[in-house]
Amino acid sequence: MPLVGTKEMFKKAYEGGYAIGAFNVNNMEIIQGIVAAAKAEQSPLILQVSAGARKYANHIYLMKLVEAAIEDTGLPICLHLDHGEDFEICKACVDGGFTSVMIDGSKHPFEENIEMTRRVVEYAHERGVVVEAELGRLAGVEDAVKVNSKDATYTDPDQAVEFVERTGCDSLAIAIGTSHGAYKFKGKPELDFARLEKITNMLPGYPLVLHGASTVIPSFVEECNKYGGKLDGAQGVPEDMLLQAGKFGVCKINIDTDLRLAMTASIRKHLVENPGDFDPRQYLKPARQAIQDMVAHKMRDVLNSSNRL
């Protein structure tokens, strides 16, 4: 089975009132853990590659690992470019075999964002590739994406409609209060569900995307800190809020920080408890299992995407 796009995935998710997890990948163990969970849960799956992942591993290596996962499991997997910052990066990934790309022009003025997005949409659609765009800016840090809280802006519903109509993008990442990184809220977590509902009502049937949606699972934070880490104050998006978002037209929920925490917590624990171990397989194997268990939980209890294939 070849890589697949998201159009049919999102149609089913929207109609079924659930969301599909888009998990950021950086190496073999992360890919294996995520894919094993998707196979066990029979869940649709998006694997996505950020600027940091491309710099770290090279998207060609990651592409081959994803192709191996498809050959091994037979799962329908979408390979997505996360936060493509310009036309050339999106073009390279379209030409390289990605089935979905994101053009992130959210830091630019509205008209410039439209023009950037429209150009990518035209190129990608001619080659059968779907395009995600972004309107509104999330605070926080994720690889090359860094936005101060003072520069963050929520998505304007009226602009969202105009943006989709003028660009032809296939899905839209919106800002309703989530943020990148492990420190998403200083106080009580809040998402603007009234804004989300308004956007959904104004764009009926249209798939929306939430970035910065890791829960920053407390047990992983505690384990990291217990075994030498320093993640005081880390806080994410409560799982019940993410489950609710899937009922309001959010078809894709991005998860990265929770993967990092699952792997790091497991490795820290293993090396403290087994100080004589130096074979990477000894600590990467349980880390891979930790990722698999966490992703399976997300699919089953948060995204509601289990048994949707």
Question: What are the roles of these predicted feature ranges?
Answer:
Residues V4-G21, D277-R281:
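Generic N-terminal amphipathic, Lys/Arg-enriched alpha-helix
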Residues K226, V237-L309:
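C-terminal alpha-helical cap/extension of soluble enzyme domains
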Residues V4-K12, N27-G52, I60-P76, G84-P207, ...:
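Alpha/beta enzyme core
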Residues H211-T215:
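Short catalytic/ligand-gating loop segments at beta-alpha or beta-beta junctions
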